[in-house]
C-alpha cells in the first residue's frame, strides 16, 4: 500500500511538472527591433521613431544606419528612453575599409555586436569570393574584439547557400572563420527561402549564432536562390510558412540572446504589433 501511494505521488509530481513546463511561455521577453523595419520613419525623425517603438515596449535596438545623426547623439536618445543598441549594422565596404570608424561608432552606441548583412557580388556567390570574405571577416573580427571588445557577426542573405562539397558555401564561411573573432546572425526567412531549415542550421552550429532576425514568409511565396524576394512577402509572424515555435525552441537551446523583428513590408506598422502579440501568445 505504501509503495502504491509513493508511486501515485511520483506520477502526480511528474504530471504537475509537465503541466508547468507547458504553461511557461516559449518567448517571455520583448523582442528587439531592426531599425531597417522603420527606415522611412527613422530617416525623417529618429527621436519620434524611438518614441513609437518605446510605446510598443521595444527597448533593444539593432541600428543599421545612423540616419544622418551621430552615434553619441543616438546613444543619448536611447538612454533618455531607457532603450539600448545591442547590435550595429554596417556595410561590407565600411567593415573592410573603415574598421576603426566602425568600432568607434559601435562603442559610442553601446553595441556589443557589429553586423554585416550583405556581401556585394555579381552573379552567383563563388568559392573564390567566400575565401576572400573569410580572410576579411577574420581580420575585421580580430580588430573589433581586441581593440573594442566587440563581437563581429555576419547575417546570412541566402546567396551563400550555393552547394559546395557536402554542404554549402554558408557552411564554408562558418567553418573557415575563426570562432574567437567571427560569429553569425541567422535570418530565418533568408535561410528558409533558399531551401534551408533554420532549425537544422542552428543545430549544426549551436555555438556560432549569437543573434536572430525574426521574419515570416507569405504562404504561397516560392523558394528561390536569388538573394531577394518581394517586400510584400514579409508577413506578420505566425501567418506565413516558417515554423516559428520550432525555431525559437532550438535558438533558446543554443543560447541565442538577441532576437530582432525585421519586417520589410510596406504594411510593417500594422504587422509589427501582430508579430509581437503572436510572440506573447507562444
Enumerate the language-model features and the residues they cover.
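A short helix->loop->beta-strand "cap" motif at the edges of active sites that frequently abuts
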Residues: 83, 111-112, 148-150, 253-257
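Acidic-and-aromatic substrate-binding clefts and catalytic sites of carbohydrate-active enzymes
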Residues: 38-44, 60-72, 90-98, 121-125, ...
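Histidine-acidic metal/acid-base catalytic patches
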Residues: 21-35, 42-54, 167-170, 174-186, ...
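Bacterial Sec-dependent N-terminal signal peptides
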Residues: 1-25
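Short acidic, glycine/proline-enriched helix-loop-strand junctions
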Residues: 70-88, 133, 148-150, 270-275, ...
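N-terminal pre-domain/capping segments
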Residues: 20-113
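Active-site acidic/histidine proton-transfer and metal-coordination neighborhood
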Residues: 51, 59-60, 92-184, 269
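Conserved beta-strand positions in the central sheet of alpha/beta enzyme cores
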Residues: 62, 87-89, 115, 153, ...
Amino acid at each position: 500500500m505504501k509503495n502504491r501511494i509513493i508511486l501515485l505521488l511520483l506520477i502526480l509530481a511528474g504530471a504537475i511538472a509537465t503541466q508547468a513546463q507547458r504553461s511557461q511561455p516559449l518567448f517571455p521577453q520583448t523582442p528587439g527591433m531592426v531599425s531597417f523595419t522603420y527606415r522611412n520613419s527613422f530617416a525623417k525623425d529618429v527621436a519620434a521613431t524611438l518614441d513609437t517603438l518605446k510605446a510598443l515596449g521595444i527597448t533593444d535596438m539593432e541600428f543599421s544606419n545612423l540616419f544622418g545623426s551621430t552615434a553619441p547623439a543616438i546613444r543619448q536618445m536611447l538612454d533618455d528612453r531607457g532603450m539600448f543598441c545591442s547590435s550595429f549594422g554596417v556595410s561590407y565596404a565600411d567593415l573592410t575599409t573603415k574598421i576603426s570608424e566602425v568600432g568607434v561608432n559601435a562603442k559610442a552606441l553601446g553595441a556589443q555586436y557589429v553586423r554585416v548583412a550583405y556581401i556585394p557580388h555579381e552573379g552567383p556567390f563563388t568559392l573564390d569570393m567566400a575565401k576572400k570574405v573569410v580572410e576579411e571577416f577574420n581580420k575585421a573580427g580580430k580588430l573589433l574584439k581586441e581593440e573594442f571588445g566587440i563581437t563581429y557577426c555576419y547575417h546570412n542573405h541566402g546567396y551563400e547557400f550555393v552547394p559546395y562539397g557536402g554542404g554549402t558555401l554558408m557552411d564554408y564561411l562558418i567553418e573557415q572563420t575563426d570562432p574567437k573573432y567571427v560569429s553569425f546572425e541567422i535570418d530565418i526567412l533568408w535561410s528558409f527561402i533558399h531551401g534551408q531549415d533554420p532549425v537544422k542550421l542552428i543545430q549544426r552550429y549551436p555555438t556560432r549564432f549569437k543573434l536572430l532576425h525574426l521574419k515570416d514568409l507569405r504562404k504561397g511565396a516560392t523558394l528561390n536562390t536569388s538573394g531577394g524576394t518581394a517586400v510584400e512577402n514579409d508577413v506578420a509572424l505566425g501567418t506565413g510558412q516558417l515554423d516559428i515555435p520550432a525555431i525559437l525552441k532550438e535558438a533558446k537551446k543554443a543560447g541565442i540572446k538577441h532576437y530582432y523583428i525585421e519586417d520589410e513590408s510596406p504594411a510593417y506598422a500594422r504587422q509589427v504589433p501582430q508579430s509581437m502579440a503572436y510572440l506573447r501568445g507562444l
